[in-house]
Amino acid sequence: VGFKAGVKEYKLTYYTPSYETKDTDILAAFRVTPQPGVPPEEAGAAVAAESSTGTWTTVWTDGLTSLDRYKGRCYHIEPVAGEETQFIAYVAYPLDLFEEGSVTNMFTSIVGNVFGFKALRALRLEDLRIPPAYVKTFQGPPHGIQVERDKLNKYGRPLLGCTIKPKLGLSAKNYGRAVYECLRGGLDFTKDDENVNSQPFMRWRDRFLFCTEALYKAQSETGEIKGHYLNATAGTCEEMIKRAVFARELGVPIVMHDYLTGGFTANTSLAHYCRDNGLLLHIHRAMHAVIDRQKNHGIHFRVLAKALRMSGGDHIHSGTVVGKLEGEREITLGFVDLLRDDFIEKDRSRGLFFTQDWVSLPGVLPVASGGIHVWHMPALTEIFGDDSVLQFGGGTLGHPWGNAPGAVANRVALEACVQARNEGRDLAREGNEIIREASKWSPELAAACEIWKEIKFEFEAMDTL
């Protein structure tokens, strides 16, 4: 026989510290927690093997291909500061292992089997470097930031949104009424909640019709372009596209999808439809915390954000840094830049393990949403800058005078913050003062300031470096 059968150590084949990474390799950084007694090199090599060409033994068909051409390689291992049992393993994958334009296939390979691997106590994918050669096989976001601004004719400020609440139980007509009030008051967008699909109390077609009516009415009264994220997420891809087609026929500007529960295949199909038909696509990340919240196991959200930019979406929820949901500031800003910018430098202080070059793939607007209200406006304006969507659900609808005044309060607060920033004032230091000044001539804002002056969601973030 030309080979020796039996179980052999992965590190003999898959640990190659002298390997020079290629410009076309997909690079991954894994946080590896090996079982006691498993050396880090063996664990890192095992990850490289099991997520590429390896299996647990030598097989005779290995001789029919060139392992050197196709194998993943663990090319560097470093300890994690402050964690004795954890290591960062860097793995390089040859580009030929992946189908072009398929996020689904990329994830099936890189995070498919290997996460259940016995020799590892835990495994987390911290970051991916997508090479330009692979990026170029994706359409990416249907439109991107600049095209969206041109479609909406809104420049020089963040966009304002609001999720309609109560999220489940309203009839379509009452739902449309709530949409109209918010848009008339000064918001740019309203949003279907992620779990509003087509339930017995409100079927999707009724909702689409009433929301569109609300949108056109608000548009004609305010002279501004308005949008409502019509959630097209459905149980089958065919049904999802049917809903998107109906939205296009109604002439609305934007639809929405839950990309993790819907899946990357469905999401990419919808993104292609949206580009072909001039619809913007808002992406909600329902289920992300199942995957990304544990510090030592799962996939970090920055990887899910990169995957979404490849699969396609014009907006994606990305934490607030200040509200009720998870998000450490530097880490959040790291993946916000990954979503918006063309070229992002490696920066370990922001959790960025690799330099990412998107080669002019359109950008995605980060959406800050979850437990935010008018007092957060200066911080949000400073942290996220102009290219973002700030979404106040309860922070609009919870206004004591109703939805429209709640919308007015948010719009006034935003315009005041943008003006103050443009005049050179420091929003971080003078934020409260700016909001107070503005509330003197806006009774709606004054009422909002009063009701939310004490609300805080202060817990330590789990997602620290």
Curated annotation (Swiss-Prot):
Organism superkingdom: Eukaryota
Post-translational modification: The disulfide bond which can form in the large chain dimeric partners within the hexadecamer appears to be associated with oxidative stress and protein turnover.
Reactions this protein catalyses: 2 (2R)-3-phosphoglycerate + 2 H(+) = D-ribulose 1,5-bisphosphate + CO2 + H2O; D-ribulose 1,5-bisphosphate + O2 = 2-phosphoglycolate + (2R)-3-phosphoglycerate + 2 H(+)
Active-site residues, as the UniProt record annotates them: K165 (proton acceptor), H284 (proton acceptor)
Function (record text): RuBisCO catalyzes two reactions: the carboxylation of D-ribulose 1,5-bisphosphate, the primary event in carbon dioxide fixation, as well as the oxidative fragmentation of the pentose substrate in the photorespiration process. Both reactions occur simultaneously and in competition at the same active site.
Compartments (UniProt record): Plastid, Chloroplast
Modified residues (N6,N6,N6-trimethyllysine): K4
The name this protein goes by in its record: Ribulose bisphosphate carboxylase large chain
Lineage, broadest ranks: Eukaryota, Viridiplantae, Streptophyta, Embryophyta, Tracheophyta
GO BP field: photorespiration; reductive pentose-phosphate cycle
Protein source organism: Cornus oblonga
InterPro entries in alphabetical order: RuBisCO, RuBisCo_large_chain_AS, RuBisCO_lsu_C, RuBisCO_lsu_C_sf, RuBisCO_lsu_fd_N, RuBisCO_lsu_N_sf, RuBisCO_lsuI
UniProt-recorded Gene Ontology molecular function terms: magnesium ion binding; monooxygenase activity; ribulose-bisphosphate carboxylase activity
Other comments on record: The basic functional RuBisCO is composed of a large chain homodimer in a 'head-to-tail' conformation. In form I RuBisCO this homodimer is arranged in a barrel-like tetramer with the small subunits forming a tetrameric 'cap' on each end of the 'barrel'.
Chief site of localization: plastid
Broadest EC class assigned to this enzyme: lyase
